[in-house]
């Protein structure tokens, strides 16, 4: 994950001081891209410990179309707590847009099922896309989508994916985002009988919060270790039937975790 550390250093070296919605303040750059060959290992940051349980459960929660944090709490995942209302609801966030995008005539589009069908039946299509950026429902969401738009691409029997992330918390959020979409590519590839290719991450406003500087310098002082390997223990009947216990990470030997405050 050397390129992740290089991005952190670039933000420190070239970033512009900006105000932000949370009032915390950031160093920010605009427009950055990283490419991860998923054949070379699972892109889970090793210069600090990442909570893989939260990453897996959040993705499974998205794929169920769920927008209430009850499932996350049942599995000791608290990453969405700060944005939920008193009933645990978040409004029409990722899961709703992925699985039930509303249409003007009252129907709902299951974007995930649609891209699965495209990958199986029309893999050369240039329209294998999922969007969470529903302009008509942004004001109902507890948090507007940060990872907003992703596209799949098949070549030489390998499945690749490119994500556009309009806003990126480099220290806290980005390691989760990279691992989550890499996991999704592995799951999609298994369901479509494809090998994994690349995960391409593209960032818009890519920033370090002003209260993450000490943690960032600590992480940059550490040497990256070998990437772990993802093992999927079984092939479920559908993408929506995976369980937490289906996944195992082999060889993950990270440096200790680094705590940092979340900007709300």
Curated annotation (Swiss-Prot):
Instruction: Tell me the InterPro entries matching this sequence.
Output: Thymidate_synth/dCMP_Mease, Thymidate_synth/dCMP_Mease_dom, Thymidate_synth/dCMP_Mease_sf, Thymidylate_synthase, Thymidylate_synthase_AS
Organism (species): Salmonella paratyphi C (strain RKS4594)
Q: What is this protein called?
A: Thymidylate synthase
Catalytic reaction(s) noted: dUMP + (6R)-5,10-methylene-5,6,7,8-tetrahydrofolate = 7,8-dihydrofolate + dTMP
Gene Ontology biological-process annotations: dTMP biosynthetic process; dTTP biosynthetic process; methylation
PROSITE patterns attached here? THYMIDYLATE_SYNTHASE
* Described purpose of this protein according to its UniProt entry: Catalyzes the reductive methylation of 2'-deoxyuridine-5'-monophosphate (dUMP) to 2'-deoxythymidine-5'-monophosphate (dTMP) while utilizing 5,10-methylenetetrahydrofolate (mTHF) as the methyl donor and reductant in the reaction, yielding dihydrofolate (DHF) as a by-product. This enzymatic reaction provides an intracellular de novo source of dTMP, an essential precursor for DNA biosynthesis.
GO cellular-component term (any): cytosol
């Amino acid at each position: 994950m050397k390129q992740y550390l290089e991005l952190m250093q670039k933000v420190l070296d070239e970033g512009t001081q900006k105000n932000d919605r949370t009032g915390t303040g950031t160093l920010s750059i605009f427009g950055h891209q990283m490419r991860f060959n998923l054949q070379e290992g699972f892109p889970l940051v090793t210069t600090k410990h990442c909570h893989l349980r939260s990453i897996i459960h959040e993705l499974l929660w998205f794929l169920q179309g769920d927008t209430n944090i009850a499932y996350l709490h049942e599995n000791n995942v608290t990453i969405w707590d700060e944005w939920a209302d008193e009933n645990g609801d978040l409004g029409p966030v990722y899961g709703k847009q992925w699985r039930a995008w509303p249409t003007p005539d009252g129907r709902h589009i299951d974007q995930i099922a649609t891209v699965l069908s495209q990958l199986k039946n029309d893999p050369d299509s240039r329209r294998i896309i999922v969007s969470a950026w529903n302009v008509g429902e942004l004001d109902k969401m507890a948090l507007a989508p940060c990872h907003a738009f992703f596209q799949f691409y098949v070549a030489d029997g390998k499945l690749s994916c490119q994500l556009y992330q309009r806003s990126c918390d480099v220290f806290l959020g980005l390691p989760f985002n990279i691992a989550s979409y890499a996991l999704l590519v592995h799951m999609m590839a298994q369901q479509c009988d494809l090998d994994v290719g690349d995960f391409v991450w593209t960032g818009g406003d890519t920033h370090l919060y002003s209260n993450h500087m000490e943690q960032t310098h600590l992480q940059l002082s550490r040497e990256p270790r070998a990437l772990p390997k993802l093992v999927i223990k079984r092939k479920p009947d559908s993408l929506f039937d995976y369980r937490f216990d289906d996944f195992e990470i082999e060889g993950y030997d990270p440096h200790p975790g680094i705590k940092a405050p979340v900007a709300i």
